Amino acid sequence: MSENETSKTGGNAGVPGSGADAPSLSDSPAISGNDAVNLAAEQAKNTAHRNIPTLDDLPIPEDTANLRLGPNLHDGLLALLPLVGVWRGEGQADTPEGGQYSFGQQIIFSHDGENYLSFESRVWRLDSEGGTVGPDQRETGFWRINLQDEIEFVCAHASGVVEIYYGQPINERAWELESASTMVTATGPVTLGPGKRLYGLLPTNELGWVDERLVDKELKPRMSAQLHRIIG
């Protein structure tokens, strides 16, 4: 197993353009609090009644991706509250091993009342006409945040990578993370360097995110997507 480490250096919260067509998060037009609430209420007409499937006989609280259903969100997670839900959409990738391609993605941020968020991402490749080609990448992990608004994200990739990210909220609708440790198994992707991620809600209340990786000593966008809420 190999390990790459990077220090937390902060950096520009903006997302540069790239072959991955990164959505612009920090440069998005501002949205007022009232407009955000009204837009969320309108979207909730189609998503508020839905939740992720669960089993009924578990003796402890089930995971929920809907703040209206299931256990109450832990008070320590209020800075991450807007992320909770199921998000689905499309994005662009530009990777050393796969080249440039389009993909579909679903991200689930859920909780069980404890002081962490569960994270799951599934990615599938798309052809030039938007049709599904097949599964591509998968991640699972946990987000935590302390009283100083310091975020910890432990992320495991199905390809044989485990990463630890640290970060902080940029504002109430955006979160920036930087990898402190990237560990790759003997059969994992040797081209995956340390990186940085940015997640944020766009003025449309869609979730945009970008993953940047160190390539030739320069951070370059690897994957990015724009996702709409389907649950929560």
Curated annotation (Swiss-Prot):
Short motif GXWXGXG, span: 85-91
Disordered: annotated segments: 1-33
InterPro entries membership: Calycin, Nb(III)_bact/plant, Nitrobindin, THAP4-like_heme-bd
Gene3D superfamilies on file: 2.40.128.20
Entry-linked Pfam families: THAP4_heme-bd
CDD domains documented for this protein: lipocalin_heme-bd-THAP4-like (cd07828)
Record's compositionally biased regions (Polar residues): 1-10
HAMAP family (alphabetical): nitrobindin
Family: Belongs to the nitrobindin family.
PANTHER family: PEROXYNITRITE ISOMERASE THAP4 (PTHR15854:SF4), THAP4 PROTEIN (PTHR15854)
Name listed for the protein in its UniProt record: Ferric nitrobindin-like protein
